[in-house]
Each structure stands twice: as C-alpha cells, then as structure tokens.
Design a protein with these regions (language model features):
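Short, charged helix-capping/linker segments at alpha-helix termini
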Residues: 12, 33-41, 52-69, 177, ...
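C-terminal edge and immediately downstream basic/flexible tail or linker adjoining helix-turn-helix-like DNA-binding
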Residues: 2-8, 12, 171-172, 188-202
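A short, charge-rich alpha-helical start-of-domain segment used by transcription regulators
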Residues: 19-23, 29-53, 141
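Amphipathic, Lys/Arg- and hydrophobic-enriched alpha-helical face
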Residues: 43-61, 77, 145, 196-197
Length: 202
C-alpha cells in the first residue's frame, strides 16, 4: 500500500531523452536511501535510459555494462546524497563521465561517436544556434558532433542529451562554469560553420 501511495506522487514521464521523476522525487530518494527495492527500481528505470544512451553515443565498448557500473556506484553512495532531482542528475552524470573516462583509459579506446541511432534529444533551451541544433534529428547531431574536439562534444552532449545546466556540466566534467560556457560557445560556433558548409533542413 505504501508503494502505491508513493507511486502516485511520481511523474510517469520517463522519455529516454530526459530522466524525470517529478514532484515525488524527494519521497523516492528517501525510500531509496533506506533500501526500498521499489524506490531503487524507480530511480534506475527513470535515469538509466539516458545514461545508456550517453554511453552508446560516446562509443563506449560495452555501454550496458558501464551503465550497470554507474548504478552500482549510485547504490553504494546514495545514502550520502543530498539534493533535488537536478542535483541527482548532475551527480549521476558525474559518475557516468568518470566511468567513461576510466573505461577509455583501461581499454585504450579513443573518444569516438557510435553509429547513429534515433535517440531523443533533451530540450535544454539556450540561444538561437542551440535551439536550431535541437531541431535537427539525433542522427544528424551525432554526425555533426563527430567533427568537434572531445571537450566541446562532451559539453554539448551533456547539455542536449542529458539536459544538464552549465553548473551541473561543470561539476560533472570537473571544469569551471566559465570554461563550460566557452566550450559550449565554441562548439556551437563550429557546428554552425559545419551547417553553413553542409546546410540541412531545420
């Protein structure tokens, strides 16, 4: 019965492009921190699709395995987490990016985008160039991002795919907010140049 009450408080919008628990997040978090299986399952199903998509689009050797490792890390440390849903998203992607970097270091894989898939891109908002970019198909964005340096690509994918704020991206990547803003500006400017050379219908 307790689970039914909690479930009613939770948003059912779990689109793969934006992990959303909704107004019931605080209740779900408290339950998860006490080890309630239903709450841990809710967090996993709410956030794992976008983490898996991020791993795939970043060309991880085994994206499913890395995603599972991310959530094992979340499970081990969730008792110490404090914050709202936005902070939780940032925290998860901090863990995810760290695992991705470790995987690249151990396997010797260079950053390389995966083959295009039809991922749902989050609508993070922003300036005209970013909004235009968000209207492109996910396959086209992947192809365009292939031409960016790794740091610019990481920032734009976290902004567009995960829907993180500049502050959250800075935390996830271990950079200053100013550095993230600069990378986003340069990345969008480079994408605009690519689009001017190879225009597509927006």
């Amino acid at each position: 019965m307790e689970r039914d009450v909690e479930d009613e408080q939770v948003s059912r919008d779990h689109s793969p492009g934006r992990a959303t628990i909704g107004p019931g997040f605080a209740s779900v978090l408290v339950a998860a921190q006490t080890g309630a299986p239903w709450a841990l399952e809710r967090l996993y199903h709410g956030f794992s699709p976008v983490v898996l998509g991020y791993m795939r689009i970043q060309g991880a050797a085994d994206p499913e395995d890395l995603t599972n490792e991310v959530f094992l890390g979340v499970l081990r440390r969730i008792g110490s987490f404090e914050g709202d849903e936005e902070k939780f998203r940032s925290w998860i992607f901090t863990i995810a990016h760290s695992r991705l970097i470790d995987d690249r270091r151990h396997t010797g894989r260079r950053p390389h985008l995966a083959e295009p898939h039809d991922y749902h891109w989050d609508r993070a908002g922003g300036d005209a160039e970013q909004e235009a970019l968000e209207r492109l198909s996910s396959q086209r964005v992947q192809a365009l991002c292939e031409g960016l340096v790794a740091d610019q690509r990481d920032v734009l994918l976290l902004r567009l795919m995960a829907g993180l704020t500049v502050e959250a991206i800075a935390e996830a990547l271990g950079k200053s907010e100013g550095a993230v803003k600069a990378l986003q500006r340069r990345g969008l400017a480079n994408l605009r140049k690519i689009l001017e050379r190879d225009p597509v219908s927006l």
